[in-house]
Amino acid sequence: METYTASIRVLAASYYSPEQVAAWAPVPPDAARWQERLARLHTIVTESDGMLAGFASYTHDGYLDFLFTHPAFARRGVASRLYQRVESALRTVGTPRVTAHVSLAARAFFDRHGFQLDAEDCVECRGAYLRRFAMRKDLPNVRLVRLRGLTNR
């Protein structure tokens, strides 16, 4: 939770007002809400010297819910490596597309990684409205194969 909060409060602060940042990353965070949300997701973490450098959480149907880097590790390729691991995991299970709701702060990252814009909207978060982007990336090398009538011949 600390990496998430620090990332928003430091790295996204220039994209959002103080009120929006406070609503998006409240202090203290709601631990029960975090546990409930993460329980439904697959999470990949990366550490450096015992510190959480970043994490990514996703569903096997291709929704990338979280991709955050601790500010101490920003601009060092942590998010790119995490994203590559997510994409690899999704390809392995045959997921044809990655989707995400992306913040203003993360939009350029997702553009660089080949995502396409589907829609733009504002979402309400604890009384504040945050601009975000629905984005997707097709994984063209994934083939959906239906296995029928296989025998041991």
Regions found by a protein language model. Give the residues of each.
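Acetyl-CoA-dependent GNAT
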Residues: 2-74, 83-85, 89, 104-105, ...
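Conserved active-site tyrosine of GNAT-family acetyltransferases
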Residues: 110-111, 115
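Conserved G/P- and acidic residue-centered "switch" motifs that form tight phosphate/ATP-binding loops
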Residues: 77
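Conserved GNAT acetyl-CoA-binding A-motif
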Residues: 90-103
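Conserved catalytic-core motifs of GNAT/GCN5-like acyltransferases
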Residues: 99-101, 116-134
